[in-house]
Amino acid sequence: MPIQITFDEQDELASDVLVVALPDHLNQLSTLTFQGHNLTELLDTYKQHHIISSEVGKVSSTRFNENGLDVRLITVGLGNLKELNRARTMEVFEKLLQTLKGNHITSADVLLQSFASKAIEKIEIAELFSLQAKKALYHFNNYKADKRVPYHLNLKIHGAEADEVTAIKDGEIIGEGIKLARDFSNIPPNILTPEYFADMISAHFEETSVEVEVKDAETLQAEGFGLIHAVGKGSEFGPRLITLTYQGADDDSAPIALVGKGITYDSGGYSIKSKLGMQEMKFDMCGSANVLGMIEAAHRLALPINIVGVIASAENMINGEAMKPDDVFTALNGETVEVLNTDAEGRLVLGDAVFHASQYQPSVILDFATLTGAAVAALGEDKAAVFKNNSDAPLEEITKIAGENGEWTFELPVTETEKHLIKKSEVADLVNHTNGMGKALFAAAFVMHFSGNIPQLHFDIAGPATTNRNNFNGPKGPTGYLIQSIVDWLRQEIK
C-alpha cells in the first residue's frame, strides 16, 4: 500500500515533518496551536516575510526550531477560502502529496484542523484527504521486470475526532475501490480475457457480502443472450456475463442497477480499427472496472442499500466465426438487431446487459461505457456525456455531486429522432449503427431502448475513462471516473 494513516489525539510527533495549510487570510481560520505554540502567529510572520506562500497548491518548506519544537514545517497554500471547493481542495492535496513524494519524505504529521474552514468542514476534509492520497499516489508496475519498491508514505493525522477518523477510513475505502478499477483496467489484454476477468472478479469478492454469478459462452447462447454471444464469438476466449448482487437492505427494497461495458479488447472486428485506433483498446473495459470499484466501496462501507451489478465482457476479434456487417442476431428481449458496423459492439453487449439488469426490477439503471468517439468530440477528453430516458432518472443529483468532485458530466439529448433511427432497418427490429451525425446520441438511444420504462442514465465515459497525462487524480492511465461521485450519490440516497 502506498500510504498508511494513523491518528493521534495528543500532540506527539511521529516524524520531523509537520504539514499545515495556509490560506490567504489567516483570520478566516480558528487559532491553530500545536504543543503550546501559536501556529497562527508563526504562519502569519513567515507569510509576511515571504518565507511561505498561500497561493493555491503552492508548497513551501522551512525549518522551525523553538522552545523544544524542532520540525521541518511544510505549508500548502489554500488561496482565498471563499473560492475553495471540493475539487480545488483535492488539487491542493495532490500538490502536497506529490511534493512529499518528490522530496522522498516517507513520514509526516498533518494538522487536520488547518485545512478546515467555513467552506469545507473538517469531516469532509478528512475524507477527501485520505481519498486523494489513495488516488494521487496510485502506482502500477505488475508487469515490469524491475520491481522497485514503490513510494510509501506514513501520515499521522492530528486533531481528528471520532467522526473524522471514520471519515478518513471511509475515504480510504472509496480510494481502494478506485484502485481496484485501475488495477483491472491496467491488466494487458492477452492476460485479461473475459474468462480471466470473470475468475478474478469471483475470487476478489469471495467471502464478502457480494455474490457473483458467471454465465459462460455456452450458457449465454442457450439462454438467449444473442448480442453478447455475437460480439464474443469471434474470439477463442468466449464472452462472459458477470452478475454481482449486494444485499445491504431489506429484500423488498428495489436495488440500484450498475451496468458496465467490459470489452477486454476491441479490434473493431471486421469493421476493423486502424493501427493507431487499436492502441489502448484494452481500456474498452473501463466501464465495467468502474462498476466493480463502486460495488467494492459500497459493500466495504456496508451501505444499507441493494445493488445489482452487471458486466458484459467479451473480446471483439476476427475469425471465421466472428459477426459480420449485415448479420442479424436476436437480443435477450426477443428483438432482432441488424449489425451494420462490428465496431459498434459496445451497445450490443450493453443491450443484453441492460435488459438482464431490468429483470431485477431496479429503481434505476446506471450504465457506464467507453462507447463513442463522438462523445469525446462533443465534450473533450475530460468530460463524460450523460443521457436520461425519462424525468425520473436522477440526473440533476448525480451531475451536481460529480461537478463538486471535479468529475464533469454534461447531458446530451436523446430525442424521437434517435429513437426512430435505431429502428431504421429493412430486415430487423433494430439496427446498431448510423452513418449520419449524432452517433453518441444514437448509441445512447440504442442502449436505453432495452431498459423499458425503468429510469436509466447512460454515461459515455470514452473521454475521461483514461488520461494521457498526470493530473490531480493520479498518474496517466485509467482514472476510475465517477466511482467517487456515484458512491457519494448512493450515500446521499440513503440519507
UniProtKB/Swiss-Prot annotation:
* Cofactor(s) for this UniProt protein: Mn(2+)
Its EC number is 3.4.11.1, 3.4.11.10
Which compartments is it annotated to reside in?
A: Cytoplasm
The record's keywords, sorted A to Z, are:
Aminopeptidase, Cytoplasm, Hydrolase, Manganese, Metal-binding, Protease
Cited Pfam families: Peptidase_M17, Peptidase_M17_N
**Reactions listed under catalytic activity:** Release of an N-terminal amino acid, Xaa-|-Yaa-, in which Xaa is preferably Leu, but may be other amino acids including Pro although not Arg or Lys, and Yaa may be Pro. Amino acid amides and methyl esters are also readily hydrolyzed, but rates on arylamides are exceedingly low; Release of an N-terminal amino acid, preferentially leucine, but not glutamic or aspartic acids
Catalytic residues (positions): 273, 347
Protein name as it appears in the record = Probable cytosol aminopeptidase
What species is given as this protein's source? Staphylococcus carnosus (strain TM300)
Lineage summary: Bacteria, Bacillati, Bacillota, Bacilli, Bacillales
